[in-house]
């Protein structure tokens, strides 16, 4: 493991300790999606720290464990910005840091509507060994992961990713559709993809008592996501697709746990992925930092 990756992990650990001991619990109801996005943004001034992990099978090669940390901040009521750090371990190969991402989501309309649009812009600086599968785009297929880490790391990727998120909530149900367009800043064509999601709490009525295993603390859902080819060959040919049920457990302490097995839907896909995540929201993080730096409350 490189010294840079050790430093990143140490910083992530220290911030997580801060989240546990220095902040009141957050009561937000998180969805179970790993790939799809709904229209809900981070509350202004709040910071959410998240860790996600993907264990993937690899036919003809070594299985892998990909992981990433997310730092999501509510800049305003209509703008959420997020920073990612990615890495992966390929069994019988090595552990590598694969890059970073800077994501921004903007919600142009106030209030709730039948369809709530969100505009998504992300810059990715990564290498070819990245395996987090945060999205599937273009002609991404399982065989892409057969290259060794040493060889894949030589491929440096600078990419802009755009999404249009259309999300609705009706009688407790959330339905979301994400359309993706990504452009490697080298001489490569635009690539396309999609993600669909539906979710609902197991119970809509909150309990009068604080409890851990109450049905309303669990949100169940399902995602489907995959690639749609590129500018020169748009469509389903030579693309991969996945179906992923998911469950989010929102604890009264403010922690959220997620679990989502993913099943490949064709021969171009990984047969099976297991994803899980843990997150914690720090209320009033922006105000705390402002006070520490001598700013106004």
Segments the model singles out, each with a brief description of its role:
Residues 8-20:
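Bacterial N-terminal signal peptides
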Residues 1-5:
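N-terminal secretory signal peptides that target proteins for export/translocation
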Residues 6-8, 34:
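Short helix-onset patch at the extreme N-terminus, typifying the N->h transition
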Residues 28-297:
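Transmembrane beta-barrel domains of Gram-negative outer membranes and organellar outer membranes
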């Amino acid at each position: 493991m490189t010294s840079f990756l050790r430093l990143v992990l140490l910083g992530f650990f220290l911030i997580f300790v801060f989240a546990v001991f220095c902040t009141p619990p957050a009561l937000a109801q998180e969805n179970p999606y790993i790939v799809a996005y709904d229209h809900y943004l981070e509350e202004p001034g709040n910071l959410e720290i998240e860790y996600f992990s993907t264990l993937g099978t690899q036919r003809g090669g070594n299985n892998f464990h990909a992981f990433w940390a997310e730092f999501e901040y509510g800049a305003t009521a209509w703008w959420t910005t997020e920073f990612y750090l990615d890495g992966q371990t390929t069994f019988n190969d090595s552990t590598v840091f694969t890059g970073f991402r800077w994501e921004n989501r903007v919600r142009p309309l106030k209030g709730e509507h039948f369809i709530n649009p969100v505009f998504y812009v992300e810059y990715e600086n990564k290498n070819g060994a990245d395996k987090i599968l945060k999205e599937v785009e273009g002609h991404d297929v399982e065989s892409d992961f057969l290259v060794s880490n040493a060889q894949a790391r030589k491929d440096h990727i600078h990419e802009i990713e755009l999404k249009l998120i259309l999300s609705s909530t009706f009688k407790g149900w959330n339905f979301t559709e994400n359309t993706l367009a990504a452009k490697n800043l080298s001489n490569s064509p635009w690539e396309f993809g999609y993600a669909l999601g539906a979710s609902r709490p197991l119970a809509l009525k909150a309990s009068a008592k604080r409890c851990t295993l109450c049905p309303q603390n669990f949100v169940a859902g399902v995602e489907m996501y995959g690639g749609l080819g590129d500018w020169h060959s748009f469509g389903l040919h030579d693309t991969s697709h996945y179906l992923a049920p998911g469950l989010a457990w929102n604890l009264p302490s403010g922690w959220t746990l997620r679990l989502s097995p993913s099943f490949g839907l064709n021969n171009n896909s990984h047969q099976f992925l297991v994803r899980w995540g843990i997150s914690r929201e720090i209320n009033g993080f922006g105000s705390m930092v402002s006070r520490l730096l001598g700013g106004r409350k």
